[in-house]
A protein has these predicted regions:
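Core dinuclear metal-dependent hydrolase active-site scaffold
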Residues: 2-55, 136-142
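Cap/insert and terminal regions of metallo-dependent hydrolase folds
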Residues: 48-137
């Protein structure tokens, strides 16, 4: 069956809840699950946060949020035209919802060597929690 907003699926040992992110481009879903250690992880999908998804995001311990570029470089990369967010956008959301851990992914790759430092530096202006900016194939202990 095709997914619907709020559907649950058992994947490995996890009860995964899928939610429609209300994309204006194409139908897309995020998901939320509780890890074996009791922590809640939410993946917002490949577009900016939509407030109608709040019940899936609020009270999570880990938020995976796309952050296409630094806010200070938004005029260069034009993330909003591509239906994407900036580091500032993701960090302000995580701060407002008091989410302790934020994973920023789906970033532009013009400065991979400096990306983590730059994204964390900008992010800390808007967010007091833990910021992770993984490289491809990185592992993060949840």
């Amino acid at each position: 069956d095709p997914l619907k907003d709020g559907d649950h699926r058992q994947i490995l040992s996890y009860d995964v809840t899928f939610f429609d992110i209300h994309s204006t481009k194409a139908r897309q879903f995020g998901f939320s699950l509780t890890l074996n250690n009791g922590k809640k992880l939410t993946f917002l999908g490949d577009e900016p946060y939509n407030p109608v998804c709040e019940k899936y995001v609020r009270d999570c311990d880990w938020l995976l949020h796309e952050a296409f570029c630094l806010y200070v470089e938004r005029d260069l990369w034009k993330p909003y035209e591509k239906h994407h967010s900036t580091v500032k956008d993701a960090c302000e959301l995580a701060q407002a919802m008091q989410i302790p851990n934020l994973v920023l992914w789906h970033t532009e790759d013009s400065n991979v060597a400096g990306r983590e430092r730059l994204y964390k530096s900008e992010g800390k202006k808007y967010y007091g929690g833990n910021i992770f900016v993984p490289d491809d194939e990185s592992l993060i202990a949840l």
